[in-house]
Regions:
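A solvent-exposed, acidic/Ser-Thr-rich amphipathic alpha-helical stretch
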Residues: 48-49, 53, 57-114
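Short, low-complexity N-terminal intrinsically disordered segments enriched in polar/charged residues
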Residues: 17-49, 53, 170-172
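Hydrophobic pocket/interface hotspot
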Residues: 39, 50-52, 59, 74, ...
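Exposed beta-sheet edge and beta->alpha loop/turn motif
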Residues: 111-147, 152
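Sec-dependent N-terminal signal peptides
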Residues: 4-14
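Solvent-exposed loop/turn segments at secondary-structure junctions
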Residues: 66-68, 123-125, 155-158
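Low-complexity, intrinsically disordered terminal/linker segments enriched in charged
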Residues: 149-172
Length: 172
């Protein structure tokens, strides 16, 4: 019995030492967080050049419907946004839990992955419907070096679908 207890104790210690703990470090003011802040300032100013520079040539863009696109298709989609909307504003929606009001954070994971996430509100005026639109969104960006390699969007795309439909009706 004594040998059994010692064996179980040794096995427990051995296996618990091998337990890998994955974790991440969250930053609210690092370089990548600032770059995403600048990204949305560029969107408000319709500065497509900044986006072309920040996103990797190997970008995989995943839209709210789960469809994947490459960088050229992503840039074409942003240009369409500029064509369909005016007075685009991105506002913090103060979803922070730390009281800072920050809606952008970057997490550096122990696996080596780095993701920046934004929780915000989009507002604009539709050029074809004339509608004032506003909705909350969440976007996650995966980094490879100082380039965004993956963008994943989470929001209801109905506003964009309605504006695109109005645009297509007028062009018939």
């Amino acid at each position: 019995m004594k040998n059994f207890i010692i064996t179980v104790l040794c096995a427990t210690v051995l296996f618990s030492c091998n337990y890998k703990k994955d974790f991440g470090v969250v930053n609210l003011e690092d370089e990548k967080t600032k770059l995403v802040e600048d990204l949305f300032k560029a969107v408000e100013k319709e500065n497509i050049g900044f986006l072309k520079e920040l996103f990797s040539k190997d970008l995989v863009f995943v839209n709210p419907d789960g469809e994947e696109f490459n960088k050229d298709e992503f840039i074409a989609g942003v240009e369409e946004l500029f064509e369909m909307f005016e007075n685009v504003k991105i506002k913090e929606n103060n979803n922070s839990t730390d009281g800072s009001g920050s809606a952008i954070e970057t997490t550096h994971y122990s696996t080596g992955d780095t993701w920046t996430e934004i929780w915000s509100d989009f507002s604009a005026n539709g050029k074809y419907t004339g509608d004032e639109v506003s909705f909350p969104f969440y976007i996650a960006y995966k980094w490879e070096g100082n380039k965004i390699i993956r963008e994943m969007q989470y929001f209801n795309p109905k506003v964009f679908d309605n504006e695109r439909e109005a645009k297509n009706m007028l062009s018939k």
